[in-house]
Regions:
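Non-catalytic terminal extensions of ATP-dependent helicases
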Residues: 1-218
Length: 218
């Protein structure tokens, strides 16, 4: 912060936010304080990646929320991915493509079932892109915002892009083709880069299993 090219006012704001994030890591028991010889010493309570980074504003929430998952669950690796994705900025073009495809599929199914036109239109309003763990994450974040006031500046956005690619065994080109999103290649590439950084550099090793490590390497 001190060496950055920000104005004094911006540096003060960054210092305040850094203090708030550090306090959050202490409150969530990621960091603990021990006093010795009249000095404070700070230690992490969990193993963190060598290049550990809080790349996203809600990375501290992600670390806390991982405690809600059952490592023995068959969907554990995918659920960790969903929690990470919820803290990322939305790749809006990709999500719109997902929603459009979901609505097109629903429309065809309703036509086949003989649902009348007006009813089909009403039902389509409730169809959107996939949002794994939406209820769990929304409830957890509501509580988190009560305990961490600065988090009120942000909101989680559950979505399934990386998870969707894994579940459908889609590579980059195949995924772009499936959603007819050739004009959104840059958006998808940036999103996947952000997702990789969060999974590789923020999720503690102890919260990763072999399946998740394989996905990150992929």
């Amino acid at each position: 912060i001190e060496d950055s090219a920000q104005t004094d006012e911006q540096k003060n704001a960054l210092r305040t936010r850094a203090d708030e994030i550090f306090r959050t890591l202490i409150d969530t028991d990621v960091i603990e304080i021990e006093q010795e010889d009249g000095r404070d010493y700070y230690y992490t309570t969990v193993d963190l990646p060598q290049d550990f980074a809080l790349d996203q504003p809600l990375s501290p929430f992600l670390i806390a929320a991982l405690e809600l998952l059952d490592p023995a669950s068959p969907s554990y690796a995918l659920d960790v991915i969903s929690m990470a994705e919820a803290t990322l900025e939305d790749p809006k073009q990709i999500l719109r493509a997902q929603e459009r495809q979901a609505r097109d599929k629903a429309m065809e199914e309703m036509k086949a079932d003989g649902v009348d036109y007006d009813e089909r239109l009403d039902r389509l309003q409730d169809i959107t892109y996939p949002k794994p763990l939406n209820d769990l994450l929304t409830e957890a974040f509501d509580q988190y915002r009560k305990d961490v006031p600065w988090a009120n500046d942000y909101w989680i956005n559950p979505k399934s892009v990386v998870r969707d690619m894994v579940e459908t065994a889609s590579d980059f080109n195949g995924y772009i083709a499936r959603y007819n999103a050739a004009r959104s290649e840059g958006t998808l590439l940036r999103y996947l880069s952000d997702a990789y950084r969060v999974l590789a550099r923020t999720v503690p090793p102890e919260k990763r299993n072999e399946e998740l490590d394989d996905i990150i390497a992929w």
